[in-house]
Amino acid sequence: MINTTKIAKNNLKQNKSKSILIIITIILSTLMLSSIGIYIVNAGAYQKENTIKYSGNYQGILANVDEKQADILSNHADVELTGEMNGVGVEKLEDDSNISLAYMNEDALKLNSFEFVKGKLPTKENEIVLDSGALKALGYKNKDLGERIKISYNDYKNDKKIEKEFIISGILKTSEISEAGKYYYAIISESYMRNTRNMSQEDFNIYVKFNDKSNLSIEQIKEKLDKIANDIGLDTINTAVNENYINALKPDMETIMGGVFVGLVIVLSSILVIYNIFYISIVTKVQEFGKLRAIGATKKQ
């Protein structure tokens, strides 16, 4: 009986080209499998980065929060960051652009992924930060830090038209979504908000990031938000989860399953190629040995 294992070993030694072909097949398979793994990791990272860019990295939001509740919330044991936002008014321009005037603290900017091109948050009453799209829409495209601009906005509380001169303290990068929707931002100082508003009647949107670093589900985050709302005396109808951000933290099963399927195809194809190389080589040798036996060669020969 012919020992096919020995024949295979001898065949590998005698036929370097076949051995090299097998090695190349294994190397290519390994490279392709590694590429799939890298693609899956990069796809997940890109999805997360893109979501944070457009949806922020806060886990939830509490709306209609008064100043006293906001103070309690900022010191809550379950909360790491609270971004405060108070809408003041909006300027509507003839080209259908809208410029939202609002107070936002540093954490609110951070949690909503605002990026400074230059400058800093306003501290004085007459200072303001605008995104580059707002400056362009207002006709102040070439204005820079320290220069004066005028804004005429409709006050949300009394619907009065208010004109105010501000000094630019910072310029924000305009997102693609803001550019497409012609919806821009102007950030006022806390002192301007307090000196022009009746704070006892004002409410805030509070963007929240929890201390808990584990990947919480949407349901778990909603429960935590509702608990916090109850703790500060806020109706739970005012809580909402940033579902886009939470979903981006989870592995994309569609991408993973696609990668696993392609990986299995590569592995099976590689096995088939290597098997065929061995099989064809062994069959050829068996045929050669059969011819030798037919003409009278002994086993030893």
Q: What would you call each of these model-derived segments?
A:
Residues K16-G44, K250-K291, K300:
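Hydrophobic alpha-helical transmembrane segments of multi-pass inner-membrane transport and secretion
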Residues K13, N75, G83-N86, F278, ...:
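Protein kinase-like catalytic domain
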Residues Q220-D226, N230, N242-G259, L264-V267:
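Extended helical coiled-coil dimerization/tether regions that scaffold
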Residues A8-K16:
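Short, Lys/Arg-rich N-terminal segment immediately upstream of the first membrane anchor
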Residues V41-E243:
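Basic-flanked hydrophobic alpha-helices used for secretion and membrane insertion
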Residues M1-K6:
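Short, membrane-interfacial amphipathic segments enriched in basic
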